[in-house]
Amino acid sequence: MVDNIQIVEALNAVLTDLTLQEISEKLEAPKSSDLGDVAFPTFTLAKTLHKAPQLIAADIVAAIDQEGFEKVVATGPYVNFFLDKVATSNQVLKTVFDLEGAYGDNVDGQGAKVTIDMSSPNIAKPMSMGHLRSTVIGNALANITAKNGYAPVKINHLGDWGTQFGKLIYAYKAWGSEEEVKSDPIATLLKYYVEFHEKAKENDSLNDEGRAWFKKLEDGDEEAHRLWQWFRAESLKEFSEIYDRLDITFDSFNGEAFYNDKMDKVVDLLEEKNLLVESQGAQIVDLSHINPNLTPAMIKRSDGATLYMTRDLAAALYRKETYDFAKSLYVVGGEQREHFVQMKAVLSLMGFEWSDDIEHIAFGLITFNGKKMSTRKGDVVLLKDVLDDAHELALKQIQEKNPDLGDKDTVAEEVGAGAVVFHDLMNDRTNNFDFNLEEVVRFEGDTGPYVQYTNARAKSILRKTSVQLTSDDLNLTDPATWDIITTLNNFPKTVQRAWQQREASIIAKYALNLSRAFNKYYANSKILTEDVQLNARLVLVKSVSIVLTESLRLLGVKAPEEM
């Protein structure tokens, strides 16, 4: 944040027991612009100073050097700073204009690696809306991670192993056909999977058949392995089409199968440390002494087959050895919370202090008309279908608003896909939310297209002028610009908070706030009037576009030049 150094130093002159860094981290934006431009809360000082926060705030204001600020006031437990508007406008606009997309970058991460386990669809099943959250939250966090100076490693831990493949192989051999699969691979494989579960309700022995085929696959049976490879290859083709549409790439596609030859090492280490206990023929790690409410971690079943826990432990060890991560994030639904608590507990018992660097980035559910989706029942909402429908809705609105726009199809794809991504990310990560596509793709309201349209509007203004913009004399005196200036000023702090809280919605909500501030200004101002402040106003418009474009990029959303 521009001018924060002055605020931090002024506070530090009074609060000598706090470091500059500690003060800087406490600064925040007031709830309303009427309260000031930057706020310093005093709650955490009450304990050490043995005073009520309101009194502490009043004491700070009485002692602080107010030179360089419009005013500094105490409002309850907050010290609120009102910045010098002309000087701050000049500083903020010059900084954004000069740095462009690098505005908001910081070097906190110092290049340290952060692995991000994300997306992870299951082979032989289509990508559904159920995969959207892990995919887009993971991608946005990777972008935010990089913006904060870290080196993200995006890992698509494919669900390409497990008892479900035994079930699928059995179903294919029992009532499937090669010709049917080749004609429509994923849809046919999904149909077999659903049919298997329907038949297994009437005949439980089918589950034994499925387990037996999976055991064959684990033991290297040639036919089982050939069918598994075929199912995997067909699935990856379809996944790649979806990822291309979302403009998402990965650094690794190492899925569950990759760790088949790495699990014995985990079992050996557990045995060496006397952590394995036999329970009803299975091998477990007892965690009750760590937390009495924690169920045992299952390592091997009674038939010798390995379990997800064994594989995830092997993956954690491999990732630490390969990437030496500073943090390892797992973007997985909130219902898996206990699994990650168990995994970290087992790694800790094994003596790996870096288990504390593993974080479960939990998220809530997407529902459609209040209903959760289930692949087993077959009532699944396909991500491809949603992206197709979003494209059509976006195209319809573009044709109405701008019939002469060139390459409408490309723009409609960027707007439609962007709308779906933005809507997911503007919701707090851990919240559940209901999905209504028509609301999501609207060009007004709290939507991705609204932010994209605002950015395109700013770019359109800049195309209408031949003025060569400079960063000289950016002293805007129009009070109508102040909301935009303070919002632009908050962007670097917003980027930091999004990383610290692992919360992409902070960026999405910021982009909406900046869009609203700009559109209010646009509706009430003559931006292109030829006067001495024309350059400053145009630099303001360009700065808005720079920061909106960067905000959208961090979220994984395109920023069309025109809409």
Curated annotation (Swiss-Prot):
<dbReference type="Pfam" id="PF05746">
    <property type="entry name" value="DALR_1"/>
</dbReference>
<keyword id="KW-0030">Aminoacyl-tRNA synthetase</keyword>
<dbReference type="InterPro" id="IPR036695">
    <property type="entry name" value="Arg-tRNA-synth_N_sf"/>
</dbReference>
<comment type="subunit">
    <text>Monomer.</text>
</comment>
<protein>
    <recommendedName>
        <fullName>Arginine--tRNA ligase</fullName>
        <ecNumber>6.1.1.19</ecNumber>
    </recommendedName>
</protein>
<dbReference type="GO" id="GO:0006420">
    <property type="term" value="P:arginyl-tRNA aminoacylation"/>
</dbReference>
<dbReference type="InterPro" id="IPR001278">
    <property type="entry name" value="Arg-tRNA-ligase"/>
</dbReference>
<dbReference type="GO" id="GO:0005524">
    <property type="term" value="F:ATP binding"/>
</dbReference>
<dbReference type="InterPro" id="IPR009080">
    <property type="entry name" value="tRNAsynth_Ia_anticodon-bd"/>
</dbReference>
<dbReference type="InterPro" id="IPR014729">
    <property type="entry name" value="Rossmann-like_a/b/a_fold"/>
</dbReference>
<feature type="short sequence motif" description="'HIGH' region">
    <location>
        <begin position="121"/>
        <end position="131"/>
    </location>
</feature>
<dbReference type="GO" id="GO:0005737">
    <property type="term" value="C:cytoplasm"/>
</dbReference>
<dbReference type="InterPro" id="IPR005148">
    <property type="entry name" value="Arg-tRNA-synth_N"/>
</dbReference>
<keyword id="KW-0648">Protein biosynthesis</keyword>
<keyword id="KW-0067">ATP-binding</keyword>
<dbReference type="Pfam" id="PF03485">
    <property type="entry name" value="Arg_tRNA_synt_N"/>
</dbReference>
<dbReference type="Pfam" id="PF00750">
    <property type="entry name" value="tRNA-synt_1d"/>
</dbReference>
<comment type="similarity">
    <text>Belongs to the class-I aminoacyl-tRNA synthetase family.</text>
</comment>
<dbReference type="InterPro" id="IPR035684">
    <property type="entry name" value="ArgRS_core"/>
</dbReference>
<keyword id="KW-0436">Ligase</keyword>
<dbReference type="InterPro" id="IPR008909">
    <property type="entry name" value="DALR_anticod-bd"/>
</dbReference>
<keyword id="KW-0547">Nucleotide-binding</keyword>
<dbReference type="GO" id="GO:0004814">
    <property type="term" value="F:arginine-tRNA ligase activity"/>
</dbReference>
<keyword id="KW-0963">Cytoplasm</keyword>
